[in-house]
Amino acid sequence: MPTQRRQFTAFSRLLHWTMAAMILTMLCVGVTMVVSLSNYHVLVSIHRPLGIAILILVVIRFGNRLLNRPPPFPATMSRAERLAATASELTLYGLMFVLPLVGWGMLSAARYPIVLYGPVHLPFILPHNAMLYAVLRQMHTVLAYLFFLTFLAHFGAILFHTLIVRDGILKRMVPWTVRPREPAPTE
């Protein structure tokens, strides 16, 4: 019988930490865009391509997740905790997919150019419609807040399990390979 993996695959961990850095950057850029109009254009030029990069990576990540089963949860986690962890993971995946699409749709409805880099522009995916733009703009804001709350719950749960419960759940996703502990010698 094959032994169960203790960690996510190296590729899964690479995707996770790359996207975590991108998402933290996106959250900071998003908040700063709203409160600092003097830097708005520079921040938007970061926000748009970063959102599309996140969209592309979440599709890759979701496919990778379907192909590679995650390691088991620690035995210390109750059924309710496992369900909450799975629900928050699915919520994060969903929001990482939907938020960039809503942003793209919002800009399309307003006919704002979606510049990725230099002359590379994304096509419009929705018709020009001011009302649709207004609805999608509100939706983008609400979903961004929901994403931030879900991210905080995810981060808080990891801190709780790492610092309080000490069940080793973070070892499943750390970037480095974790070797199993050798049993202590008996006398």
List PLM regions with ranges.
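Membrane-embedded alpha-helical bundles that constitute the cytochrome b-like, heme-associated redox core
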Residues: 1-187
